[in-house]
Amino acid sequence: MKTTTCSLLICISLLQLMVPVNTDETIEIIVENKVKELLANPANYPSTVTKTLSCTSVKTMNRWASCPAGMTATGCACGFACGSWEIQSGDTCNCLCLLVDWTTARCCQLS
């Protein structure tokens, strides 16, 4: 009796797994449909981003290069093949090698 009951429960469980599931509303399908809708009608969904990124380079003939006011240093380059540098205070490049003949700071600003 116990074996029959156990077998019956296993069969019922397996049958439930075999029942087709409605996959029309999975999160993947919903996202895919929304992306297609946005791409098909770009005029209906204007961009909320109105800022532009402007960048410039500042080169000095020493170990330090500072960005103009309001700009942030995003990267540095150093002369004499020095690959060791750091950004200090968010707007100044400092080359860390002993011998450096120039420093360039890449400065950017969102406006």
Curated annotation (Swiss-Prot):
GO terms for biological process: response to nematode; response to selenium ion. Transmembrane segments: none annotated. GO terms for cellular component: extracellular region. It is found in: Secreted. The keyword Metal-binding does not apply. Its main location: secreted. Residues 1-23 form the signal peptide. Pfam families: Resistin. The keyword Metal-binding does not apply. One of its GO terms (molecular function) is hormone activity. Keywords: Disulfide bond, Hormone, Secreted, Signal. Disulfide bonds join C55-C108, C67-C107, C76-C93, C78-C95, C82-C97. It comes from the Eukaryota. Highest levels in adipose tissue. Probable hormone. Plays a role in pulmonary vascular remodeling. Belongs to the resistin/FIZZ family. Monomer. This is Resistin-like alpha. It comes from Mus musculus. The lineage of its organism: Eukaryota, Metazoa, Chordata, Craniata, Vertebrata.
